[in-house]
Amino acid sequence: MSHHIEKHPTDPFILLTVNPDYNMAEELAISNQTVANLLDQSSEKQVYIIHFKNKLSLDEIITGANRVGRGENSLWHHPNIKKIILITNSAAIRVSAQGMSSDTFGNLNVAVVASLDEALHHARQLA
């Protein structure tokens, strides 16, 4: 399976795991809609954690950032998102995440960590 989305059973976290066979051009809209549905159904704000197990090209990073961070219905501006945490070792994604805090992307608050344990620890501090 190219990606997996799960709502934590007890904590207010949604985890998207992006596997190496994920095709952003074909699957981003699908995974975004699934996460949006979970957020719509939530009675409390969620920490949205994305675990990148794949390598993204610069074009994919730019396309992805524009699709999730800009526009009226952008997922990362959903009112039920408390914080976004990215798990990656990619320097390009790390720099892109910093850019998401700009006015162009609506001043998003995106953290980048290196492991799932670190992401869960950070998310639990916010809960």
Model-derived features: positions:
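Amphipathic, Lys/Arg-enriched alpha-helical "gate/interface" segment within cytosolic domains
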Residues: 1-127
